Amino acid sequence: MVTDEARLASICCSTRGVEYRKIYMFEIKDACLTIGRRTIVRHFSFCAPDGQISVVQGAPRSGKTLLLAAMLGFVPLAEGWVTINGEVLNPSTACFFRAQMAYVPQTFSVPMPTTVAQVLDIVSTGWRKYEGRTTIADVQQSWPALALDPQLWQVNFNALTPDVRKRILLSFAVCARHRVLVVDEPTEGQTPEMAAAMMRLIKAEADKGTAVLLTTTSDEVAAEADNTIVLRGAVE
């Protein structure tokens, strides 16, 4: 069950007597998401406006990650639609739109021994860049704030603990210079100090005009949001 189903779904404005619908950078409208015969989310509407932090909050197994997968075009909606900058996301456009987003998944590993530097090379290859290829020097600017050691570049990514992997991926994402930043459970498994550091970095991206979309179980993360919607229920 979703509370506040229509929160920030659509805003109408009037200028010189002409009404128009404000275009948000990231919007999901009247969405229904099902697994088999079970409805996980019903008539869900939400927006992630430019320059703001928007949060989908819920308990573990409430469907947050599944909903995020649908919003990114990985999982089809039973009803409703997702738009990016006013354009509808569908199977033929999903890859194009995802390439314009910086996405940090809840968990991530690579299928073979790969250094952190090689992971950056793999990830950045898929980014649609406006200012050239992202380099180690670009990414490393945020590493002191995230307590990341420069020697990690030559370490096997899969050998690192999940909390360190998440901070590394966030450092990659903020260098992508995309208009949308999506992070699934940004502070999960982090110390309070590191969680606060990550949220400062994320807030700095919103302050630059990026549309930020987060999922979380944390009240502390939700407290940092400009817009929050809560999922209730469970995915079995």
Identify what each model region corresponds to:
Residues 26, 41-43:
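Conserved structural motif at the start of ABC-family nucleotide-binding domains
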Residues 169-170:
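Hydrophobic anchor residue at the start of the ABC signature
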